[in-house]
Amino acid sequence: MLKTALALGLAAIAAVSTTSLPATANDAAGTYKLDRAHASLVWKVNHLGLSFYTARFDTFDATLDINPDEPQSAKLEVTVDPTSIRTGFPFSDAKDFDKELVQSPNFFNAKEHPEIKFVSTSIERTGDKTAKVTGDLTLLGVTKPVTLDVTLNGQMAHPMKKKPALGFSGVGKIKRSEFGMTHLVGGVGDEVELLLEAEFIKE
């Protein structure tokens, strides 16, 4: 469930960045890499109908290829390391909950599925700085189409890198059962909310 977040969120940048980047097309076009120091991937899932349990992935990467003259041809590829999950479980002396989620066949089963991947397939602009990005998400060996709502927060020449930079927020929802993660559905929600914040810098 968490893995999805990452892939989805990053995909969104493709949509808005290609339609909202600065007017200098020659400068804006090209390949952008995720600034991992300024990115976060968080997921939320309902717990017993009482609250939303939150966690994150610490290790993920993404590449965005864009051409302002052909925004619909933008391509985003994202990879997530499922072993980088962090739940903040407070009783680590009792058990390693993160490791349990990573290794268990009921959840991420990272030994059999060491990577989560997203590849964008289409972009639909919904506003000056918003878009819906659809792509193929592969999780637990299952590939399904997913869509993320993305907002371009801003773009500029990075003050330190001296290169074009983009910043965005992405939100989306998936059903983990559709990817085969059905364990404890009922007590732990099937629907997973994804929250992404990210900056991209042109290579």
Predicted regions and their residues:
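Bacterial N-terminal signal peptides that target proteins for export
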Residues: 1-9
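C-terminal segment of classical bacterial N-terminal signal peptides
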Residues: 14-22
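Low-complexity, acidic/polar, glycine-enriched regions of mature
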Residues: 21-203
